[in-house]
Amino acid sequence: MVLVLVFQGSISVRAQEVKLGNVAGLAPLPNILFILADDLGYGDVSCYNRDSKVPTPNLDRLALEGMRFTDAHSPSTVCTPTRYSLLTGQMAFRINYRNVFSGIGGPCLIKNNQLTLPQMLRERGYSTAMTGKWHIGLSFLDQGGKLITKPDLEGVKLVDYSRAISDAPIHRGFDRFFGTACCPTTDFLYAFIDGDRIPVPPTKLLDKTKLPKHAYSVDNRLGMVAPDFNLEEVDMVFLKKSREFLESHVLRSPKKPFFLFHSMQAIHLPSFPAPQFNGITKTGPHGDFIHQLDHIVGELMKTLEKLGVADNTLVVFTSDNGPETTSVVRMRADYGHDGAKPWRGVKRDQWEGGHRVPFLVRWPNNVAPNSSSSQTISLTDIMATCAALTGATLPNNAAEDSFNILPVFLGKAGGKPIRDFTLHQTNSLALSIRQGPWKYLDHRGSGGNRYEKGELAAFALPDNAPTALGQLYNLETDPGETKNLYFEQPLKVKELKAKLDELVKAGRSAPVMR
């Protein structure tokens, strides 16, 4: 691991904006472990889906020991925009970004002077670390020192691996980073980044003939692979590195709080579970991969317990978007398991299955055990919540779409909604807005996947308003989004569309002077 001090100028300025103490009145400040799954659906976790065919005992234990949110949402229906929004508290459509990076990916979507979640926490005295998939963009240089702009495999072959990455996570608020540029087993560059370097560069083309072949091994592209990079062991390597950080930190700085962002590969296709998990469930390689994810969560919790810090660590577990199309279609057909259940839609779709995600919080003596919340929340809310938790003051040009949900964690929100409105976006930059039970989609169709043909055609629903320019659903009476009320409720359509336009133009949805 590499320890680097960055942004000295901006830290000195922002330090003046930070309150002393912490708003929650908690001393000492808690550690924070944030675990982000990849493409894990609402129905993939057994505490959310009684009919799940895959056991997830460690996630179920998290729910029993903490709070389970039933109306939590990723800000986007695909990876990169969600990750950007999580670490900045800002919707990615505000920087006109919608899709995902691949290969070396970049440049970084987060501006050099933009306040991030880890930077904010570091300014409050936290040691900050990230392990796993970054996927928010990096800048690699060629042998002439020029920024590489060519995509995919062609760009990977141009990288001068003796040069540092100029906008790595350690330049955006993390003290330490070990992980990958994009999807670890998908995207052209199969190598680990340590700090701002790739210590073991890729030396040869990936030999795909040696990888598992099955219905869930799709989405693995030909790329350059490093000698130490085993595609079936990536998540176990990430687990090892996160454990090492936790053990080292508690040994060397027992009184200093930590923020660890553990960003998994699982369960993004291809489903390449580590060998010890092959066949552990009766639901094929993808089910085994889900079980491996659950195992990793359990191992991280065991590490906290072994180190004696579990009771003063806020643990948050969630997913970056809904489940992938192929995994849902195949798992339904092969094993009767539905990762999107009970919602309509999958990853990329504006319907609930594309962005309603599992969200679990554990914090002994603060978050009530075996509790649940139906508050509508977004992953963008993490930044404002951590600001409230640690006493940081958010400037008005930061975390523009982040709401403080700490009162919900602490059981002090009452029945009042934290959010009046919640925004969503898809990989086509289609937008939607939610207010209470009402959800307005400012577009036709899913906003992402095509249901006219292909593997999703069998799951297309009849369109009762085919000429409508948008969609309106009442999730209280129609949680499956089966009946478009666009023509039946014209005033509600007008109201929500106007509010959506207003929030887009305003540049923020969160209140000022939080």
PLM segments and residue spans:
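Bacterial N-terminal signal peptides
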Residues: 1-8
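Formylglycine-dependent sulfatase
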Residues: 15-471, 477-514
